[in-house]
Amino acid sequence: MKKISMVIVAISAMISLSGCHEDPTYVDSYFQRQSVIEELSNELKGQYSSIFIPVIYNASQEQMDYKSLWKGEVTENGQPIIHYTFGGYENRTVTLQQVPISWISFVIKDIKLAEAVKLLPDYDISIPYSFASSDEETGEASKMGKIIYSDSKVPVTLNYGGKQHLVLFNFKCPSQFVFDADKRPISPGRIQLELKSIIVDNVIVQEINGYLGGECFLSIMGKTDPISK
């Protein structure tokens, strides 16, 4: 009886393993392999520049004239240029350099908070990135992948209303750039950065959703061009 029980357990285990192998959700993705992640991230590593396109509306849906406020480098026709850096395997983040977060003041409803934010210097914003298959059903046979950017929070300390406050700007980066791993070199593509909420002392004081006709703070970095590798 004991031997029969052991045989049944062994057969059940074999069936279970066989089922896992056939189920595509258990197939090891090409883009989950450490060697692939290391190779792709080190290939992306370097300095890039891009056209910077802010789309900023206040509650009255008036677009901000950002070109007159931009203090940095511009193209021949006056479009702002932003620089950013992709870290390699050891630091898989993209750092947007000298982002004018003081412009967020144009969409803030709290007047005192808006006045304090308007005085902020430019900030570097770091966004973690990762790789994934763009077609999960094909499993490891597919080398079509995508770059995924994670959310990022920018903390600042501000004095307003007679008190010191910890303010968090919560950014979302919905961009997902699809690429073929067999075609090199890969490029980061367009990066889109959206302000989703403003948090003061651990309390959400304002949510930003331009799609509902409210305030909007959206920055689009156009096609990327490497300036050094």
Question: Can you say where each PLM-predicted feature lies in the sequence?
Answer:
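Edge beta-strand at a domain terminus
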Residues: 24-32, 164-229
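Positively charged n-region of N-terminal signal peptides that target proteins for export
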Residues: 1-4
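Surface-exposed strand-loop-strand hairpins of Gram-negative outer-membrane beta-barrel proteins
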Residues: 60-76, 84, 88
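Tryptophan-anchored aromatic micro-motifs
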Residues: 41-65
